[in-house]
């Protein structure tokens, strides 16, 4: 006679339908971290691979990670806040922090336009793509008007716009901007994608 299968472990996440997953830490008034990641990497959505970096913060933050960079940032954010306000959850975060990696620039623009930068106590730009003029102009203006709450972690190539990359880095200054360079081990240089992804490891040090 075969042994009965063990019950599946309960899902530790709350699912924001069509938008992403929400982790709640034990302290109800912990800060809320809103994360929009980039394009698929090796066929894996950012809603999966961004948890590789965010899991280290689970004891200190409520964390939402979007399914992918194709979500509507406004709808995702509103879904999170609606979930937190439900009677059986009833959480009001002490502050809200916006984290944008790579292609997360786009849903980031959505939520910044609809909710305003003032909603967030901190805005982290992590090697975001700014290869279109409209995107570059948007984030230049954001840095001009909100430098005191922003950090910028970047590679030499991720922005796809060296002029805007340098403008934002200079606008924020050396204490708020970090240039991540490729590791070199002997004659072997770290692949560009590995350096790009490693900006997340560096960026979460600011949290």
Per-region residue spans from a language model:
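Conserved hydrolase catalytic core segment
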Residues: 110-121
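Active-site nucleophile loop of the alpha/beta-hydrolase fold
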Residues: 124-132, 154-158
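Glycine-rich nucleophile elbow surrounding the catalytic serine of serine-hydrolase chemistry
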Residues: 100-110
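C-terminal catalytic histidine-bearing segment of alpha/beta-hydrolase fold enzymes
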Residues: 20, 151-207
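Alpha-helical scaffolding within the catalytic cores
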Residues: 19, 45-56, 79-83, 108-112, ...
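A domain-start/cap signature at the N-terminus of enzymes
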Residues: 1-32
